[in-house]
Design a protein with these regions (language model features):
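Conserved phosphate-binding/catalytic region of the ribokinase-like
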Residues: 5-9, 13-17, 21, 31-64, ...
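Conserved short loop/turn motifs at secondary-structure junctions
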Residues: 22-26
């Protein structure tokens, strides 16, 4: 009954973006995610964030979202891959998740963003953004949430993955202070 109520509310709302994130407390799982994705407002930008640092979950359950924002640990768990270096690891998840944008969070090493390549030879299918957190990190809790929120808003406003990645990284860095 709760799932029906929640998906009905979601389908009746008007939103430019919908972020699916519940810190893996049970709302989003393999059985419910398809219902939530189907209920998202037409043309809304959908974002999946599994938040499984302390619980088991699989970011691939959000396959089909427009953007995913996992950390390295979540990607390695989803793919069962503890050995690959970051670029091939992210490329594999990007392909399997069928998302438009994958922002792979790397903690103090920054972030690598994967996107569809264009025919323009100057546009890569991936790029990295260094961490903008200062050396005096006081509280990293919430940095991923700040990145998620600001990157989503910027992507919806600009349609530019590079700008969204940079603004999200700035927000994450500020959250650490």
């Amino acid at each position: 009954e709760t799932l029906v109520d929640m998906t009905t509310q979601l389908s009746n709302c008007h939103a430019d973006a919908v972020i699916f994130s519940d810190f893996r407390h049970g709302i989003f799982n393999k059985a419910t995610i398809p219902s939530f994705l189907a209920a998202a407002p037409r043309n809304a930008f959908t974002v999946g964030d599994s938040q499984v640092a302390s619980r088991w979950g699989n970011i691939l359950e959000f396959a089909g979202c427009d953007m995913l924002t996992p950390n390295e640990e979540e990607v390695r768990f989803a793919l069962g891959d503890q050995d690959s270096v970051i670029r091939p690891l992210g490329s594999t998840l990007y392909d399997q998740a069928r998302c438009k944008i994958l922002m792979l969070k790397l903690g103090d090493r920054g972030m690598m963003t994967f996107r569809a390549p264009l025919e323009d030879a100057d546009r890569r299918s991936f790029f990295s953004v260094d961490s903008l957190a200062r050396e005096n990190i006081l509280d990293p809790v919430g940095a991923g949430d700040a990145l998620l929120a600001y990157a989503t808003l910027t992507q919806v406003a600009t349609g530019n993955e590079a700008v969204a990645s940079i603004i999200g990284t700035v927000a994450a860095g500020l959250e650490c202070e």
